Amino acid sequence: MANTVKVKLVKGLIGTRETHRATVRGLGLRGINSVSELEDTPAVRGMINKVSYLVKVVS
């Protein structure tokens, strides 16, 4: 099985850019404190990097 990464949304999306909101939805995150487990690929890492001020990598 491929490596996975867990991402948690730690800040709300109000006042953020529309593209950043779309990126958070693309990561599978809905509300604050929601956690999503994703495949550890360069594309996912880039999305996490783009919204790093909103999310936290759990593992």
Swiss-Prot record:
Disulfide bonds: none
Gene Ontology molecular functions: structural constituent of ribosome
Alphabetized InterPro entries for the sequence: Ribo_uL30_ferredoxin-like_sf, Ribosomal_uL30_bac-type, Ribosomal_uL30_ferredoxin-like
Protein name: Large ribosomal subunit protein uL30
Source species: Herminiimonas arsenicoxydans
Any GO BP: translation
Keyword Ribosomal protein: yes
Cited PANTHER family: LARGE RIBOSOMAL SUBUNIT PROTEIN UL30M, MITOCHONDRIAL RIBOSOMAL PROTEIN L30
Assembly, per entry: Part of the 50S ribosomal subunit.
